[in-house]
Amino acid sequence: MGDPIVEPRSSALESSSLSSDRLSSKRAAHLELEDGTRYEGRAFGANRSISGEVVFATGMVGYPESLTDPSYRGQLLTLTYPLIGNYGVPARNADDPLNPGFESSRIQAQALVIQNLSPDYSHWNASSSLEQWLIEEGIPGVQGIDVRALTRRLRDNGTLRGRLLIDESPDRDEVANSPYQDPGSRNVVAEVSCTEPILHRCGNEGAVRVILVDCGAKTSIVRSLIARGADVLQVPWDHDFVAEAGDAVLLSNGPGDPKNAPETVDNIRRALAGSRPLMGICLGNQLLALAAGFDTYKLDFGHRSQNQPCVEVGTARCWVTSQNHGYAVDGTSAPEGWEEWFINANDGSN
């Protein structure tokens, strides 16, 4: 593979108006990609090394929501906005499973890769700093990385696996000498789905019931359905939802390759023979497509941001959408009687 390519530490960190002696850590760390590229930085958060798939997200805000999004399971999340952590982490209600400001009950990303970590935070609803939260959840991070250079490499070469190696972590050598972890090689859906049905009531008598097939569902989906006057029956990814009573079925978002969840595809295929409406979001869309006879494929670097433009096929109408997935539906594989409804305006994918 040749000598490793070493990218310099981000100069933006050195020139920041934030005093470097107030930053949380002097621990040396580096991000190592499978193509040999190496990015030097400093560790923060939990003191552990980790391996996974390196991806990037281009949103300017929303790091608590992104970190807790189950679609990031097994991934080292790179945030392209240069200053992260300045508004802290929202307060959490232990009695509310649908906490606003979070997409699940825990951080799902393997690690966080950023340019600058804000040493201070300020927000009326903040209860802790970003670093304190990462430590509590056992999630490592690295700052001082030139995230623009890293993003360009991922954009131009496709998503790569990588290792975050922290010099002082007790597991550094073990992670450094182990194969790169690839979430696409296993069924990560089973790792993030609920394990038994959960009924969320909206409080309206006679409300419609939506069956939410949880393949890694974000809590904002449940909150949105409840706000629209629907009861939500959340069921595990491999649950036989066809036998459940309900007015519609929503196939949730989630992590990984849709082809690693054949049980869900089989259930959807049986449901398509009925008359009940089915809808899919991100991974759910891909699972629905597989059940209908389409093929799916891995995108070069995925769609991960709050500003993905989608065009309704056959019209000039465009919606700006929030997306987080690394796979897409192959529109050229459409079976008879099916056609694409929306495509991504950036790359034409479904």
Model-based region annotation:
Residues 205-210, 315-318, 335:
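Beta-strand-turn-beta hairpins that frame and shape the catalytic cleft
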Residues 33, 312, 344-345:
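Acidic surface patches and DE-rich sequence motifs
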Residues 348-350:
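Short, surface-exposed beta-strand/loop micro-motifs that present aromatic residues
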Residues 140, 231-233, 295, 320, ...:
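Conserved beta-strand segments of alpha/beta enzyme cores
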Residues 209-280, 287:
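Phosphate-binding active sites in nucleotide-utilizing proteins
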Residues 252-331:
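Cysteine-nucleophile active-site neighborhood
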Residues 2-236, 258:
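RNA-binding accessory domains that recognize and position tRNA/RNA substrates
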Residues 337-345:
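Short, Gly/Ser/Thr-enriched beta-strand-loop segments that form substrate-interacting elements
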